UniProtKB/Swiss-Prot annotation:
Chain intervals for the UniProt region annotation (Disordered): 649-671
Gene: pnp
Lineage, uppermost ranks: Bacteria, Pseudomonadati, Campylobacterota, Epsilonproteobacteria, Campylobacterales
Domain KH: 581-641
Protein's organism: Campylobacter curvus (strain 525.92)
Role played: Involved in mRNA degradation. Catalyzes the phosphorolysis of single-stranded polyribonucleotides processively in the 3'- to 5'-direction.
Gene Ontology MF annotations: 3'-5'-RNA exonuclease activity; magnesium ion binding; polyribonucleotide nucleotidyltransferase activity; RNA binding
Protein name, entry field: Polyribonucleotide nucleotidyltransferase
Main location class: cytoplasm
Entry keywords, A to Z: Cytoplasm, Magnesium, Metal-binding, Nucleotidyltransferase, RNA-binding, Transferase
């Protein structure tokens, strides 16, 4: 059975009961030439643990774009970063829909079978998964819809195409039901524009247009709190339209809810009553233990004590059941203290940020580093600068060619940061998600045309909530410590929310306890002028626009406080120039690039080896980028390249001068005999010796082992040829 729904700037064609009919729910969704299959499967046996055992997998098939997987193994292997992040979006959007106490292992699989380059796979993937879940026998009684909002030509656009999104200042992804918002991800996208600046004419007869200077201006495109609320409201109306359309089309096809046993919120009410009567103060004292490991230890002691009590022995209360009830009672106390007394576990006010300390360039040999500590959360963020050759290449199903990423952010969360003895493993979904959020927050502040490839690594050394936002703050200062001239400092703060009946409380800079026992995790990052990135996950049924606005403005006050401290630290940064890579960027005639490369790359390899530098070339623009550890090596390599591109006999690929052939070119190569003597001039001095100009612009290397006294550029000395291999000439001093 097929349904066609035209909504939110796209036509969605759903196929029901056509494929995967043994799954609890399945739907095939087509938008233009994109086809996605979403399935839902459920086990019949509950897990004993107190959590929702939901697994979401998003898989892109290479054949969807008419490709065969690259590499030695010609099949899809582990998911890429985009697949992992998309699976997280779907998971976070659908998880709040499941009823409390649902403990049946459930798997949602979304497979991309055909990919249209212009269709947003994250929007289509979530909508397909939502309908499949809604149609299943799992007691989920409302569909979720995901939409993306762009900001193009000063107006909001719903579900822009992939090409349209590239010209957008905003990338906002919102998921929700017709009544509530469930998940939000947002980033601002920096844009460059040309700016004409009039200058004073030197020659009054000059063409007036030549009296103008054209410069590039970059706008971070931060969004104010009001504009964000406006954009989310715009998305909410689109979600309402789609959700109503889904319900109307599919409610008749929804399977009857399976008869499932839901776990009670409190496994044994008598234990809860007993704890409240005899151990309430002990639980409150345990809550005040800030470290997760210490708090767990104290609660464990209380559980053991209760289990040894005569009442527990008589009633047959098992320690495991007592621990579960105690954990839920602890959550109740935390929430009651916040709602009724305005008191947080660490004694802070609801809008108070924990104490902050900042140290920069704590690692002497790293390009830039920052140790950012906020309460019991500590991030060591390290910046490394590289060249174009260090950039990350990756494939996207909707792009024909590999994309190049020159700004990377890696987030690492070792077990010792929370006092656990756990093995160090490859980064999981959480690490990838936190790193991606920090990257999105900082990216607009970095020059789009930066000559460097930049890698930030955040090592979480302590964690008690908000480690991703500590990574943003530390990352902004690590960039400055590495000499990267970012446009503005960016700070981040994690917000929380507690709902009890008709009361609610918004919390600034939440710690781990408040994250675990609260109803919302809302991370907001930005500069003093607005928001560059945010992420919201909701644990209850949803959140209203009014409460969201309150949280945004409270986050702004917290962010401004943090930025003030960061500006103080920034003013004290001393960049360690000695460890930074040296970079030279210059242009030559594009036709001369081939002379720099040489036959089969021989010349450029010799330059790289001789001067110990890395070289990146732009054939079309004629741009040459040289990077190295020593400035004199970089300068010497630049001089050498300029010399070989300025020779009259150098010529571009395919430009054969009239009357010359390959034999003429061979005859033009300088040839010397061993022992030939010359009055040479020192052209450049490098770590391993000096380059001496002999005749006709030909250079030779006088190795440092043969130099007895210091040499300077321009010195004249008598040398002789000791060896020649191709164009490489080795020299010795003539006594």
């Amino acid at each position: 059975m097929q349904y066609s729904i035209e909504v939110n700037n796209q036509v969605e064609i759903f196929d029901l009961n056509k494929v995967a009919k043994q799954a609890a729910g399945a739907v095939m969704l087509r938008v233009k030439n994109t086809v996605v299959l979403a399935t839902v499967a459920r086990d019949d046996v509950q897990v004993e643990e107190d959590f929702l055992p939901l697994t979401v997998q998003y898989i892109e098939k290479a054949y969807a774009a008419g490709r065969i997987p690259g590499g030695y193994v010609k099949r899809e292997t582990k998911p890429g970063d985009f697949e992992t992040l998309t699976a997280r979006i779907i998971d976070r959007s659908l998880r709040p829909l499941f009823p409390k106490g649902y403990a049946y292992p459930t798997q949602i699989v979304v497979m991309v079978l055909s990919a249209d380059p212009e269709v947003d796979l994250q929007v289509v993937g979530l909508n397909a998964a939502s309908v499949a879940l809604y149609l299943s026998d799992i007691p989920v009684n409302r569909p979720v819809c995901g939409v993306r909002v762009g900001y193009i030509d000063d107006k909001f656009v719903i579900n822009p195409s992939n090409s349209e999104l590239k010209s957008s200042a905003l990338d906002l992804y919102v998921a929700g039901t017709k009544d509530e918002l469930l998940m939000i991800e947002m980033r601002s996208i920096a844009q460059q524009s040309s700016q004409i600046i009039p200058i004073i004419a030197i020659d009054p007869m000059m063409d007036p247009s030549l009296n103008d200077s054209i410069t590039q201006k970059q706008d971070m495109n931060e969004f104010s709190e009001d504009r964000i609320v406006e954009a989310i409201d715009f998305a909410g109306k689109a979600i309402l339209r789609a959700s109503n359309a889904y319900e109307e089309a599919f409610k008749e096809h929804k399977k009857e809810d399976a008869i499932l046993e839901l776990k009670p919120e409190i496994e044994n009410e008598n234990i809860a009553i007993y704890i409240d009567k005899f151990y309430k103060n002990d639980v409150k004292n345990a809550i005040n233990q800030m470290a997760k490991s210490e708090r767990a230890s104290e609660l464990g002691k209380i559980a053991k004590q209760i289990a040894s009590d005569e009442v527990a022995q008589k009633e047959g209360w098992e320690e495991g059941v007592i621990s579960n009830v105690l954990g839920k009672y602890k959550k109740k106390i935390v929430r009651e203290q916040i709602i009724n007394e305005g008191v947080r576990a660490d004694g802070r006010a609801l809008d108070e940020v924990r104490p902050i300390s900042i140290e920069t360039n704590v690692l002497p040999n790293a390009h830039g580093s920052c140790l950012f500590t906020r309460g019991q959360t500590q991030a060591l963020v390290v910046a490394t600068l590289g060249t174009d050759g260090d950039a990350q290449m990756y494939d996207i199903l909707t792009e024909k060619t590999a994309l190049i990423e020159k700004f990377m952010f890696n987030y690492n969360f070792p077990g010792f940061s929370v006092g656990e003895a756990s093995p160090l493993k490859a980064p999981g979904r959480r690490e990838l998600g936190h790193g991606n959020l920090a990257k999105r927050a900082l990216a607009p502040s970095i020059d789009i045309n930066s000559p460097y490839t930049i890698r930030l690594v955040s090592e979480i050394l302590e964690s008690n909530g908000s480690s991703s936002m500590a990574s943003v703050c530390g990352g902004a200062l690590a960039l400055r410590a590495a000499g990267v001239d970012t446009q503005k400092l960016v700070a981040g703060v994690a917000m929380g929310l507690i709902f009890e009946g008709d009361k609610h409380a918004v919390l600034t800079d939440i710690m781990g306890l408040e994250d675990h026992d609260g109803d919302m995790d809302f991370k907001v990052a930005g500069s003093s002028d607005g928001i560059t990135a945010l992420q919201m996950d909701i644990k209850l049924g949803g959140i209203s626009l009014e409460v969201l606005k309150e949280a945004l403005y409270q986050a702004k006050r917290g962010r401004e406080h943090i930025l003030n401290l960061m500006h103080q630290a920034d003013s004290k940064i001393e960049v360690n120039e000695d460890v930074l890579p040296k970079l030279e960027l210059f242009s030559v005639d594009p036709s001369k690039i081939v002379d720099i490369i040489g036959q089969a790359g021989k010349t450029i390899k010799e330059i790289i080896e001789r001067f110990e530098v890395s070289i990146d070339l732009d054939r079309e623009k004629g741009e040459v980028k040289i990077a190295g550890g020593a400035k004199k090596n970089v300068d010497a390599a630049k001089d050498y390249i300029i010399s070989i591109t300025s020779k009259e006999n150098s010529r571009g690929f395919g430009k054969k001068p009239h009357g010359h052939d390959r034999r003429d070119k061979d005859r033009q190569k300088p040839t010397f005999n061993i022992g030939d003597e010359f009055d040479g001039v020192v052209k450049s001095v490098v770590d391993f010796g000096a380059f001496i100009e002999l005749k006709d612009g030909v250079d030779g290397l006088l190795h440092i082992s043969k130099i007895k006294t210091p040499l300077n550029v321009g010195d004249r000395l008598k040398v002789c040829v000791s060896e020649q291999k191709g164009n490489k000439i080795s020299l010795s001093l003539v006594e």
